Amino acid sequence: MNSKQYAYMNRSVRPSVSEIAAGLEKKFEITCLARDQEKLKLYRAICGVIAKVMIIPPECYIVVNKMPTYAGDVQAVYEKLTSAEIEWVAEKYCAQKDRIQNPHEWMRTTLYNSPEDMELDLLNQVLTDWGG
C-alpha cells in the first residue's frame, strides 16, 4: 500500500463535511446569492447536502430519484454544478417547501437532476412567453 492509498483510507486525512461545505460556499459564492439570512441558511443547507455526498466512497450506493445510485455518479454531477443551478434549486425549494416531506432527500435528488431540469424549465418559460 503506498502513502496515497493509506491517506485515502485514513479518514482523518480526508476533508470533513464542514470543510467541504465551506469550500462549496466559496465556490458558489452563496453570500452574494443570498438576499437575507433565511436564504443564506438555505444555501448553506444545500452545500451541506452536497458535502455529505462528496465524502461517501464512490462505489457505495445512495438513493437518488428513489433509486439506488452509485455515489460516484452523483459526485460527478455535483462537481459540475454552478451557482445558477444552486440558485435554481433554492428557488424551487422555496416554492414548494410546505409540500416537501424529506428536505435532505429532495435536495439530493433535485441537485442531481438540476442540470437537465433547469434547462427544461427555462425552455418551458421561453415557449410560454412566446405563446407556444
Locations of the language-model features?
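Electrostatic interaction modules used in gene-expression and signaling proteins
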Residues: 1-132
